[in-house]
Structure formats: structure tokens, C-alpha cells
């Protein structure tokens, strides 16, 4: 057996987190406190410190808020100037930032709760502008979808996926979440979606962030939603619902063009359709021959998919390929569930958990900003690396704070000299 010596020096295995804490403070602290307001004037923690403490949980490999007190406090508190708060303080802050649910009644008389969390949604956009991830006056591509979060909280409702939970509507630009509005899990995806999207668009436009192209699934294919989306973007691309009138038009079509997309052979065509009275749009039709050879009662030997759009210039192939990129956004939800705590919601009610969803969305957006600034190849990382890889290859490095010549210095115990460029701040 190897000889063991015990050293009582204050070393931490999370040496990489300190530079991230400093960058969070430099980039976002002022934006957070000016948007949410000062939480205290003398003693206590500001909201920027609370969000930074929550960020450290997930960027150090934690899975729930309590990890900051149970496992990380003794390491994070080694920083000479930046304070870390307890899990109880984070949970109290979530309650303080909670806004009341809005209850809507459907035509059938059923009631559904929504939570808009306006202030936190505004902060989400302002933080992206402060990071430089969004720029005022520019146009972006926009995606919207509903994510079903499985949970057995007090007010969780049964979803169509056969589990209890919530179904928040999530708006995404590029790889960044720009808006979240939570809803009861049993709410139909189209119910009040127009109002949700309109609020998200108006928040973006208030910050002079504009939408060039919007992509959505068939849950957004209704007249009132399409009218509203068209008013806030140049072009929209929405998966169209199939109906008997569409089949009559599709079966009579000629001039199908055979193309290969991602190694799969499809046939493409497009027509003008009047899906709603007096409103003609372009319908891009994609069909694929059934592999099993069986005939469908409606579609025959093909499987049909349609995209409704007001883009009359792009080719059918370009439109299909652009719409297919929407599938990559599912990675964001997977990332939030497994890396940023969406699968372990901390509170018992939807209104409070909505604040948590937005807090962690802000943290993930900040993580993406860090990956853009970091010379990832020097740490064996890529810009698309997941949080677990980031923890192993960047955060997990032995370190020790010392004070010499009236200055605080962080000693990093690593043969990777790239860390030297990250710790050049004088803490006096």
C-alpha cells in the first residue's frame, strides 16, 4: 500500500470556477441588479450574487440547489471578494421574484393557469445583450416550441404524454433561450399561444431585436397564430396540418422533383393554397416512399409532410433544409433537463418554478457566452461541449488562494499554461 500523508492546506478541486465567477460579475451583475432592483441596501445578498451562486452549482457539476450548501460552499467561499449564498437564500429569492399566475378559461369552460414572469423574461433578453450574444438593431432566426417537463409537484397536471408536469412555451434564437412562459401540463398547445408569442415578440422588439424568419411546428398552425407571427417577422415556416382538402390537391400534383437530403431521397413540390379564406400562402410539400411497402388509407404509398410559408422566392429544397434545422433545438431542452436542473425543479408550485426555469436559462446562455470567448481547444473542449465535459476539462483543476505582497493570487496546480491567461485580476 502506498504511503499517505495528510495536508491540511485549503486546496479546492474546483479551481476553474473562480474565473467564471469573475466574468459573471463583470458581465452581468449590473444588468441583473438594475433590472430586478436592489434586494438589500446594507447586509444580505443582491440578486446578482444569488444568480452567481446558482450558476456555480451547475458549472461545478451539481444537480440541485442544495448542492451549494452541502458540497460547494467551503470551496466557493475561498474567493477573497466574491460571496456565495446558501441554498435557503436562493430559494427565498425565487419566492421574492415570483409573479402570480394568470387563469384563462377555454370555450368549453375549463380553466388553465399561465405564468408570464415578465420581469425575469426581460432580464433574460437584457443579459443576452449585455453578453453581446444579441445585438440591438439586428435580425435573427426564431424558433418556438413547447417542452413537457415531467414533475409531480403540487399543481402539476396530466399531459398528453401520460405523465404529470408543466408545458412551458420556449422561444429560442440561435442556441439561446430568449423567452419562457409556463403553462399547465394539460393545456392544449394552441390555447392562448397567440398571446404568448405576441408578448415574446414585443419584449424582443422593445430591445430592438427583430425576427427575420420564424419556425414552428404544427401546434402553431392556426389562423390567429399565423396572422400574429406574420406581423412580427419577415418570413414564417410552420408545419401544416394535413386535411382532406390538402390530399385532393397533393394527389393531383405533377412535376415532383427528386432530391437527396441528409442521405434520404425525397420528392418535393409546392403550390399556393388558401388555407383560410382570403389568405393564400405557399405550401411546400415533401413526400417519401414508404419503406415497408404498405399502403396508407389516406396517403397511399407515400408519407407526406407540408410546410406553410410566406416565402415565395426560396426553392422548395432550401425551405425544407431550413425547417429541418429546427430539430437541432431539441438538444437545448435535453441540455436544460440534464445539465441545468429542469428535471429537478426546486419548488412546489408552477409560479415559483417558472422563475427557476428562467434563472437556469440565463445561466445556460451565459455558459454559451463563456464557450464563445474561451480558447476551447487549449482545454480539449469544443464550442458545443456539454456542461459535464466542461466540468471535467476546465473546472476540475486543483487550486489554492494565497496572499503575497498584499495581493491575492490563485495558484493553479496544472501543466496547462492556458489557465494563466484567465487569472490576471488584482483583488488587492
Task: Tell me the role of every PLM-derived stretch.
Residues 53-54, 68, 86-90, 140-148, ...:
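Short, conserved catalytic/metal-binding motifs centered on acidic residues
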Residues 343-374, 378-406:
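Basic, amphipathic alpha-helical segments enriched in Lys/Arg and hydrophobic/aromatic residues
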Residues 188-245:
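Domain-level cores of phosphate- or acyl-group-handling catalytic modules
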Residues 147-149, 176, 183-185, 243, ...:
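Short, glycine-/Ser/Thr-/acidic-enriched flexible segments
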Residues 235-338, 424-428:
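An anionic, glycine-rich sequence signature occurring as long contiguous blocks
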Residues 1-163, 170-186, 193-207, 396-428:
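Dynamic "connector" segments at or just before major functional cores
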Residues 1, 31-34, 72, 298-303, ...:
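Short acidic (Asp/Glu) and glycine-rich catalytic loops that position anionic groups and cofactors
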Residues 68, 259, 316-350, 355, ...:
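Short amphipathic alpha-helical "interface-anchor" segments enriched in bulky aromatics
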Amino acid at each position: 500500500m502506498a504511503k499517505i500523508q495528510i495536508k491540511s492546506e485549503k486546496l479546492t478541486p474546483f479551481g476553474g470556477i473562480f474565473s467564471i465567477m469573475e466574468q459573471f460579475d463583470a458581465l452581468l451583475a449590473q444588468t441583473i441588479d438594475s433590472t430586478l432592483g436592489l434586494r438589500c441596501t446594507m447586509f444580505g445578498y443582491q440578486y446578482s450574487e444569488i444568480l452567481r451562486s446558482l450558476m456555480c452549482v451547475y458549472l461545478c457539476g451539481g444537480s440541485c440547489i442544495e448542492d451549494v450548501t452541502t458540497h460547494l460552499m467551503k470551496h466557493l467561499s475561498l474567493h477573497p471578494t466574491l460571496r456565495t449564498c446558501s441554498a435557503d437564500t436562493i430559494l427565498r429569492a425565487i419566492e421574492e421574484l415570483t409573479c402570480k399566475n394568470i387563469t384563462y378559461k377555454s370555450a368549453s369552460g375549463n380553466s388553465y393557469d399561465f405564468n408570464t414572469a415578465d420581469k425575469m423574461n426581460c432580464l433574460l433578453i437584457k443579459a443576452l445583450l449585455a453578453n453581446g450574444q444579441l445585438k440591438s438593431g439586428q435580425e435573427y432566426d426564431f424558433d418556438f416550441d413547447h417542452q413537457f417537463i415531467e414533475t409531480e409537484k403540487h399543481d402539476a397536471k396530466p399531459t398528453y404524454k401520460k405523465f404529470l408536469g408543466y408545458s412551458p412555451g420556449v422561444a429560442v434564437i440561435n442556441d439561446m433561450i430568449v423567452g419562457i412562459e409556463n403553462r399547465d401540463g394539460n393545456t392544449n398547445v394552441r390555447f392562448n399561444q397567440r398571446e404568448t408569442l405576441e408578448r415574446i415578440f414585443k419584449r424582443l422588439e422593445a430591445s430592438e431585436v427583430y425576427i427575420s424568419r420564424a419556425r414552428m411546428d404544427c401546434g402553431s398552425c392556426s389562423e390567429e397564430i399565423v396572422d400574429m407571427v406574420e406581423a412580427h417577422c419577415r418570413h414564417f415556416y410552420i408545419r401544416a396540418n394535413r386535411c382532406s382538402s390538402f390530399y385532393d390537391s397533393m394527389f393531383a400534383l405533377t412535376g415532383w422533383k427528386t432530391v437527396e437530403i441528409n442521405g434520404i431521397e425525397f420528392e418535393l413540390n409546392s403550390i399556393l393554397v388558401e388555407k383560410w379564406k382570403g389568405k393564400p400562402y405557399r405550401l411546400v410539400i415533401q413526400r417519401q416512399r414508404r419503406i415497408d411497402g404498405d399502403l396508407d388509407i389516406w396517403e397511399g404509398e407515400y408519407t407526406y409532410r407540408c410546410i406553410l410559408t410566406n416565402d415565395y422566392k426560396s426553392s422548395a429544397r432550401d425551405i425544407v433544409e431550413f425547417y429541418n434545422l429546427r430539430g437541432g433545438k431539441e438538444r437545448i431542452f435535453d441540455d436544460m433537463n440534464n445539465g441545468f436542473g429542469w428535471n429537478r425543479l426546486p419548488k412546489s408550485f408552477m409560479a415559483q418554478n417558472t422563475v427557476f426555469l428562467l434563472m437556469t436559462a440565463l445561466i445556460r446562455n451565459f455558459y454559451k457566452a463563456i464557450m464563445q470567448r474561451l480558447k476551447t481547444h487549449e482545454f480539449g473542449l469544443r464550442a458545443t461541449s456539454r456542461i459535464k465535459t466542461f466540468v471535467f476539462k476546465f473546472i476540475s483543476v486543483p487550486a489554492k488562494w494565497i496572499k503575497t505582497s498584499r495581493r491575492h493570487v490563485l495558484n493553479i496546480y496544472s501543466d496547462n499554461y492556458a489557465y494563466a491567461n484567465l487569472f490576471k485580476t488584482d483583488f488587492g
